[in-house]
């Protein structure tokens, strides 16, 4: 049984790692901790532009239509870098709930 990531998943992981390292997510996290902000809006905007928030949204709704495994790949890199962004609440909780229980209009 192969429990390794696929080549595409490894590429996604590497690209996420490069992006977050380039953005210096750890430094941004320190700045957020020293402020009254709960997350970094600039980093979050860049993540949204990359399409990461649409990982689990089906392509028919302009998402990426990827699986939970790709979602975990991104989440792992965000956690590794301690990226101060609302990824969990936005993508795990809200998006998954909307996909599962939302009306067509909401989707």
Task: Set out the residue ranges of the language-model regions.
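Intrinsic disorder at enzyme termini
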Residues: 1-8
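A non-catalytic, amphipathic alpha-helix used as a structural packing/dimerization or gating element
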Residues: 8-18
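Glycine-rich flavin
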Residues: 21-107
